[in-house]
Amino acid sequence: MLSQLRGKIIVAVLIGLAVVVVLGLFSDLRQVGASFQQFNWAMIPAILGFTLLNYGLRWLKWDYYLRKLDMGHGVSRGASGLLFTSGMVMAVTPGKVGEVLKSYLLRTMNGTPVAASAPIVLAERLTDGLAMLLLMGLGLTLYPPARPLFALLVVASAAGIVILQFRPLCERILAQIGRMPFGGKIAPPLTTIYESTRHLLWWRLLVVATAISVVSWFGECIAMYYVLRGLGIAPSWYLLLVATFVFAASTLFGLVSFLPGGLGVSEATSTGMLVVLVPMALGPATAATLIIRFCTLWFGVTLGAGALAILSRRYQLDQRPPEEQSLPANEAADPKIA
């Protein structure tokens, strides 16, 4: 497994390096270098601390989903933490969909079918997106051009949740798929995926998970604030609002771009908005973007690689592919929600 992932991670790292080079060429390299030299590196512990707060709370959300769907049998809290952290190595995949790796690892640990647990990753991404929309909404008055896309994402998210909760329509679609050629093979796992997804988007779970996401991602918004403070920007509530809006918007735009890790889109959005809203010169804005990306995205990828290496040794993932095991039907297709 690790041998297959290494190539993908290396490609993502190369893309990330290319983004750094392009940003450097687009900006004044001397200004960027000067900004790094002037940066107050004593801010790094606070920046990484708030990033770790985000990771910790998101792990709680992952574990909350796991226990609510009765899929955590045989998985200790520590193992759950390693499992969650290992998924962060796939944060550089398009839309973070590669984090379904957690489902394969969970199958190895306790036999939970991938089709049953994969919707947890979908629910994580959806609630993260909703949290980003809420955080971004706090600063919409700062940047009116972002309003149309914000409205579109709100409508699309609401429509998707409503459609998934409308069971007759979804069951009709699944029945049609089952009657198609080869549909008999994919309809059962799709039904399992739908049942898990529908329960995960039940309003009480949705509200709790979204609330956790808002608090967790606000931690990284505060990390962005400390990056700007490290570059010498005077502290103020306005600066915190700008940091929250810029980080949330750039992360969200990167997510919906479906580029690996949002690479390129997130960086360009963040740099451009910092220039307009702080305001600050292009060189320092580029430095701020690079620092926050290394302290969030790439920090998480590094932690994920370490956690995955531990799990690989523990479960010998390189020696054998995980075998598919089945749960009892009532656990796979009828997860509990209370």
State where each predicted segment sits.
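Membrane-embedded alpha-helical core segments of multi-pass
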Residues: 98, 131-138, 154-157, 220
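Predominantly cytoplasmic-facing regulatory/coupling regions of multi-pass membrane proteins
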Residues: 1-85, 142-254, 280, 286-290, ...
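Membrane-interface alpha-helices at helix entry/exit sites of multi-pass transporters
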Residues: 77-80, 100, 112-123, 280-291
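Membrane-embedded alpha-helical segments of transport systems
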Residues: 86-94, 115-140, 290-302
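Transmembrane alpha-helix interface/packing and boundary motifs in multi-pass membrane proteins
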Residues: 50, 86-95, 246-267
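Transmembrane helical bundles of ABC transporters
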Residues: 60-64, 68-72, 77, 97-105, ...
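Short intracellular "coupling" helices and adjacent cytoplasmic loop segments at the cytosolic face
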Residues: 73, 85-100, 105, 197, ...
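Interfacial segments of multi-pass membrane proteins
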Residues: 106-114, 268-284
